[in-house]
């Protein structure tokens, strides 16, 4: 049975941590975003207006390559969904940080690349797991992992950016319909440091996988 699971959620939600936990639990291959090897991301944080389109096209290419590899592996867990990159782009377009025409071009490109074609396996996941966190939890985890370009101590304006981002996530999750989905409460269930919370999260995911016939 092919089982492709993707994680989603804002910066600092714990996607990579849950990817590792879930991949070990299910005995599947884990795929990671590779933030530290992304040459565009630090540039984006310095000048979002200039680098939004470049960052999103870079990520689109990277994620499509990951999806193709994940399909070949048959069973996999990825720490970021290709669908939520458009959320960042839309937020920047709405706030005039990005050009609306660039956003439309990107969105059309994404839809064309994700379209199912005869004879090719579907690029859609079997399950999307969304980790909901509050701004407070988000900021604590961003500070803890210590990536310099993400810190509000370096750039205080990032706090407003993160707060705006959270406002886009809930509607995005509610409207997501490319696959079955489940929401994990990342505030209530600290699966990174609390083993009981981790067991509860894995139980919820296992139940969802059984419900959709993938376990």
Swiss-Prot record:
Family annotation (Pfam families):
dNK (PF01712)
Enzyme class name: transferase
Keywords, A to Z, come to: ATP-binding, Kinase, Nucleotide-binding, Transferase
Signal sequence coordinates: none
This enzyme's EC code(s): 2.7.1.76
GO molecular function term, any single one: ATP binding
The residues the record assigns to binding substrate are 33, 45, 56, 80, 85, 150
Binding residue positions for ATP: 9-17
Indicate the residues that form the catalytic site.
79
Q: Cellular component terms, GO, for this chain's entry?
A: cytoplasm
Q: Which reaction does it catalyse?
A: 2'-deoxyadenosine + ATP = dAMP + ADP + H(+)
> Domain of life of the organism in this record?
Bacteria
Family note: Belongs to the DCK/DGK family.
Q: Any idea what job this protein has?
A: DGK/DAK plays an essential role in generating the deoxyribonucleotide precursors, dGTP and dATP, for DNA metabolism.
Complex formation: Heterodimer of a deoxyadenosine (DAK) and a deoxyguanosine kinase (DGK).
Protein name listed in UniProt: Deoxyadenosine kinase
């Amino acid at each position: 049975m092919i089982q492709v699971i993707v994680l989603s959620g804002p910066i600092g939600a714990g996607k990579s941590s849950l990817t590792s936990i879930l991949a070990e639990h299910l005995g599947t291959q884990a795929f990671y975003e590779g933030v530290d090897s992304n040459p565009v991301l630090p540039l984006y944080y310095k000048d979002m207006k200039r680098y939004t389109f470049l960052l999103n096209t870079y990520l689109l290419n990277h994620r499509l390559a990951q999806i193709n590899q994940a399909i070949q592996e048959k069973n996999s867990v990825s720490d970021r969904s290709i669908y939520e990159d458009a959320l960042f782009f839309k937020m920047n377009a709405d706030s005039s940080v990005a050009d609306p025409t660039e956003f439309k071009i990107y969105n059309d490109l994404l839809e064309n690349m994700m379209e199912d074609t005869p004879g090719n396996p579907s690029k859609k996941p079997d399950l999307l797991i969304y980790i909901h966190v509050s701004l407070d939890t988000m900021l604590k985890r961003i500070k803890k992992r210590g990536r310099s370009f993400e810190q509000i101590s370096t750039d205080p304006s990032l706090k407003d950016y993160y707060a705006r981002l959270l406002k886009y996530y809930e509607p995005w999750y509610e409207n997501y319909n490319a696959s079955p989905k489940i929401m994990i409460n990342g505030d209530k269930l600290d699966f990174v440091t609390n083993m009981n919370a981790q067991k509860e999260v894995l139980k919820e995911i296992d139940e969802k996988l059984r419900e959709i016939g993938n376990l």
